Amino acid sequence: KTRCRANLKRLLTPRHIAFVGGKAVEDCINATRKSGFTGQIWAVHPKYTELAGVVCVPSLADLPEPPDATLIAVSRERTLDVVAELNAMGAGGAVSIVGEFAETGEDGAALQARLVTAAGDLALVGPNCLGVMNMFDGMAVWGGDNVFSPVMGDGVALISQSGYVAYSVTNVERALPLGYAISMGNQAVLNVADYIDAMLNDSRVRSIGLYLEGIVDIAAFSVAAMRAVKQGVPLVALKAGGTQESAELAQSHSGTLAVDNEIWSALFRRLAIVEVGSPKALIEALKLLGSPKPPKGNRIVAAANSGGYAA
């Protein structure tokens, strides 16, 4: 995965972003502009002459050079062809926002396996995801409108298996210096360990939040988590699937197999990962642990102006 991980860096800090799809990509193009991206924006469509004010070229082969980042918003079958072509031309990374892959059953899982083969060294995020944003540098390859708040100096990162959880956290105005947000989706090519490593390669990241429905590679996840411990970057995890019903929903949502939450909690304790029980707690923990001088121990005093709130 060495080259794939190098391409992930290109995806997160692109010089140019290509958009492949019809009218659905117009909101995505506008989101990229809104994020503060100052690089080149390209649109690819065989019939449209322009999308969101960007002149279209009919094919990827007509682009000036291989794009560092690409947002793909075409059918799942067509996605395979686009991904294969991007890999062949030496593109950096891509975000596939379309679903109906492994999360839908055996047929979708088979199609996703073909997608992985087609991707090769391409840093593919998704499928079935919302995208990535880097607000340290002003960039988003994102599946729609969002709040994009620039981060000056150090900040935190969010890696989420749910697009909606990523969307919700990134749109919360709670003084959270969110430098990176990554919606992983099905983790077909890149998984949570790859994203953690990418965040740890950026010294501006002080803490990393995780929303997980499952982990595809426990060994790689453990290695990445221990690297975070060594670098002094706290990991905060919110795990879905606390009940049988929610575990089954997680499986249908992102193709994740259900595992007893007590097992996950034991793993988190072993890897010094802070576990929280709600999105709000995830946000507040990230704010605390991402501060310039996070607490070194567990001796914390809380002060409140009401006995009821304190209780």
Q: What residues fall within each predicted segment?
A:
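Catalytic-core regions of core metabolic enzymes
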Residues: 1-311
